[in-house]
């Protein structure tokens, strides 16, 4: 199932098109992630593209917000990645978002919301009615964003253990 590209006018003068990732986008995704996280992870992103940009596309979604007009801004203004997961700890099939990033200078312009809306639509078309993500406790900006999109605490508690 192909994701229909959707062109929208974000709250800027930049026309944005949300579409599936392409191989030519990966250097831009790597650059955006490196600028935001201050960590270079090219091997990781190439692997994510291989798994989420090429395989099982009916249940995996790697979408980018493409800059359509402003040559002074980066080509990829943001991305979102998710997949349909089923039966983990008894959960019925649901959409999981595990990555979302927007160019820092383009935040608060509707790009993150456009990406979130696009992946929500893909999950819905694939037949799931619930969407989940995880947010670090010390990431209030991310928490506020996801809450502004209608997400709230779910029925699961994340647990972890150091393995040293």
What are these regions (language model features)?
Residues 40-62, 68:
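Active-site rim helix/loop that mediates acceptor-substrate recognition in acyltransferases
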Residues 108-121, 148:
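Conserved acetyl-CoA-binding loop-helix of GNAT-fold acetyltransferases
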Residues 73-84, 96, 101:
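Conserved beta-strand in the GNAT
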Residues 60-80:
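Conserved beta-hairpin
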Residues 85-97, 107, 154:
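A conserved beta-turn-beta hairpin within the catalytic core of GNAT-like acetyltransferases
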Residues 123-135:
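Conserved GNAT acetyl-CoA-binding A-motif
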């Amino acid at each position: 199932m192909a994701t229909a590209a959707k062109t929208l006018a974000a709250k800027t003068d930049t026309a944005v098109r949300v579409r599936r990732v392409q191989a030519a986008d990966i250097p831009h995704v790597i650059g955006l992630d490196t600028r935001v996280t201050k960590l270079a992870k090219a091997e990781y992103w190439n692997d994510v593209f291989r798994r989420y940009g090429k395989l099982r596309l009916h249940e995996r979604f790697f979408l980018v917000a493409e800059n359509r007009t402003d040559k002074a801004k980066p080509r990829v203004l943001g991305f979102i990645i998710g997949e349909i997961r089923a039966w983990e700890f008894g959960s019925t099939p649901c959409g999981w978002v595990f990555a979302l990033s927007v160019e820092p200078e383009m935040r608060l312009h509707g790009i993150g919301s456009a990406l979130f809306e696009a992946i929500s639509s893909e999950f819905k078309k694939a037949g799931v009615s619930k969407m989940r993500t995880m947010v670090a406790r010390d990431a209030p900006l991310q928490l506020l964003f996801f809450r502004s999109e209608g997400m709230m605490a779910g029925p699961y508690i994340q647990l972890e253990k150091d393995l040293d």
